[in-house]
Amino acid sequence: MKKKMLEGIEQEVITETLDNGLKIFLMPFKNRKNYSINYMTIFGAAIDKFKVNGKVCTPPSGVAHFLEHKMFEQETGEDPFEFFSKTGSDANASTGYKSTSYTVEGINNIEENLEFLLNYVNSPYFTDENVEKEKNIIVEEINMYSDEPESRMYNESSKAIFKRHPMRIDIGGTEKSVRNITKEDLYCCYNAFYIPSNMYLFISGNFDVESILEVIKNNKLLNEEKNSVAVSVIRPNEPLEVNKKKIEIKLDNVVKPKMIFTLKISLKDLHFKDKYKFVLLTTFIYDILYGSASIFKEEALSDNLFTEFVASKMVIDDFLLIEFMAESSSPEKLKEKIVEYFNNKEITKDDVERYKKTYISSYVLSSDRVQSTLNGVIESVVDYGDVIYDKINIIRSITLDDVLLAKSKIDIDNSSLVIAYSKK
């Protein structure tokens, strides 16, 4: 067991790796009543090809999401959601491109809830019948999301950005791919990726560390000996250049045009803290140039270029995506203004110092919340490979030269624009 503090906020992080490879991260809070648990496998929709003991597997798209659904069906017939409801807790699960998480939040019964969580995630039960039954449910879910403008636009944006990467396909897959999923596909993926050495257990909040570790180490299903497997993920050779510069679509439920303008930036050869620092520097850039207090936003609003505007980022494999999402009657003009500001707007030392204070303040304030602390540690581990304990010191070390150097490495022309117009 190792103990280390998140610097600047004095939050302890206790880490331990079990003999079976499970990596545990505990963040005990003394001044909070609630807790949050996240049991995660590094298996998401972006993994669509892999080797198991030398054999290549290419399951249908959407299998990670399908697997998440089926984990809630137990051979005993017990419903995990019903169990957690009876203990006064909230349970959920989510599949992303990088990972799949099973979560529990509550105030009481943490040991009982943790035991049940470990048991059901380690008890797969897939049959031909229950797999077939689930297909209609998931297809209905896919069709429901395909009618939502934002969901459809994200899918089109991924196709514009990526040429070969699995992110081109929606997390849930397609109706055709879902119809082709078999129980053998589910067991193949489960046995390859739902193994302790590929999983993480994050717990934050009010709990006794020794009692929690005892529950984990004594859980029979988690610690039973399993057949060893050699798994290697096969990544596509994805080029840096975007696949398409522009896509226009027409949708029924769009009134004013919507747009997603995405930059594709290489993170190749950047690892751990260097990778984190570069992503942080890009955050400085888009907050300074396009944030709520920027001249850009003031001018764009004055020119009626948007009614909604937000920027976000995503790290996926060797790429950083920066996305500008807006509702705009003139999406082409708005995109041109974004590019113009990137190329011509000066970033000053005062800008950098102001946002350093903003980021540090935000980090300190969020550290007092159980869920925020948990999410911060999870993001560090999933995106950068380990906990980054000295985030505050990295923020403090940022200089104007750092920001300008990072900006010089961004090719804003390596971008795509997706516009959704009304069909009417």
PLM regions with names:
Residues M1-D79, Y187-K297, S415-K424:
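His/Glu-rich zincin catalytic helix
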